[in-house]
Each structure stands twice: as structure tokens, then as C-alpha cells.
Amino acid sequence: MRLFLLLPALSLAAASCSMQPTPSSLSGSWTQPVPGQPGHVQGMQLLPDGRARSINMRTLLYRSWQLDGKRLTLTGKSIGNGNSSLFTTTSTIDRLSRTTLILNRDGNREAYTR
């Protein structure tokens, strides 16, 4: 009988920790620690209108974002060594909560917090 009552409670708890990716659930600032620089963060700001901005990244300038199911596509401009190029990256959203975003691109997982 206890197991019968426990299963719905566990299901509800698991569902509350995870969100479906929607433009409104993704909008906001997402950051991660800068490797080798304790106390510094970098990341992206996803605006509700589909524009994107980089946070503390001078050579990687995000311009826009798009959501297709669980796939997040970011576009922008990469600047370095006197050259610049446009880029598009698509990642799978492995996990999304109010405070955590985990992206997977080609097996490389990146964790962000809000």
C-alpha cells in the first residue's frame, strides 16, 4: 500500500524538476563558470523575441536563437585574429529546469545556470 502511494508522489516530484523546452521557459540569462577563472562566468542571454546576446564573451557574439522541439539553434559571429565568420550551432536540450540548462552537442555536454 505504501508503494502505491509513493509512486504518484515520486512522479510528481520528477515532473516538477524538469520542464518542457518552450521559448518562454528558455528566455533569460544562462551562465557557466569560465574555465581557469574562478569567480567569472560566461554564457548567453536568450531574449523572448528570438534575439540572443553573449555574456562575457568578446570573440563569440550570439545574435539569434530558435527552438525546434528539444533542439536549440544559436547563430552569431565568431571574431578572432583579425578574421570573423558567421556560425550556427544546434544542441539538444538534455535537461531544463527553472535554474539549470544542460545542452548536448555532438556528445559534449555543457551545463548552464540561471
Language model regions located:
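Lipid interaction determinants
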Residues: 15-114
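Sec-dependent bacterial lipoprotein signal peptides
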Residues: 1-15
